């Protein structure tokens, strides 16, 4: 029986008619988190590239030419907010969609992310399906889809 759901994987593979899969640069200092994000995005048709920290991200931008970035905040050498500020300060990456995926869940962190122009802010632990939906939306909308999924001190989500 045919599904009434749209073929999202086919949509992603066509990447808005460009003939290639959308590229996501996953930036996190934890190899486990990088792999978790990568596997979930690859299963949904994204081409995934990995970076260990903000400097590694900036070094890979030209060769990868990502359609979006997932970015942790707390990383060695160059943290996520400093990386994001550099991305927003360069004409070529000023509007590049960025989804923060981090354990930093304070209101001040969310506010700083908004000020720097992130499309979404997901906190760890995150729901892989929500991550995929959020990245897909950021890639295909091109506009801010700011959402904040931040855990409360009791472990529930806002």
Report residues per predicted region.
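Short hydrophobic/Thr-rich beta-strand motif most characteristic of the beta2 strand and flanking loop
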Residues: 45-52, 60
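Charged docking surfaces used in two-component/phosphorelay signaling
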Residues: 35-43
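Short, glycine/charged-rich "phosphate-handling" switch motifs in NTP-dependent
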Residues: 119
């Amino acid at each position: 029986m045919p599904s009434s759901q749209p073929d999202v994987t086919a949509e992603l593979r066509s990447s808005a008619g460009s003939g290639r899969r959308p590229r996501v640069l996953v930036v996190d200092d934890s190899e486990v988190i990088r792999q978790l994000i990568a596997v979930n995005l690859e299963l949904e048709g994204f081409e995934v590239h990995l970076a260990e920290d903000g400097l590694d991200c900036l070094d890979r931008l030209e060769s990868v030419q990502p359609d979006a970035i997932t970015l942790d905040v707390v990383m060695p050498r160059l943290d996520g907010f400093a990386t994001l500020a550099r991305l927003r300060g360069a004409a070529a990456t000023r509007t590049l969609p960025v989804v923060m995926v981090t354990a930093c869940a304070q209101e001040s962190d969310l506010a700083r992310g908004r000020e720097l122009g992130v499309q979404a802010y997901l906190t760890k632990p995150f729901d892989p399906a929500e991550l995929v939906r959020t990245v897909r939306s950021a890639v295909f909308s091109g506009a801010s889809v700011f959402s904040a999924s931040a855990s409360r001190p009791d472990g529930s989500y806002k």
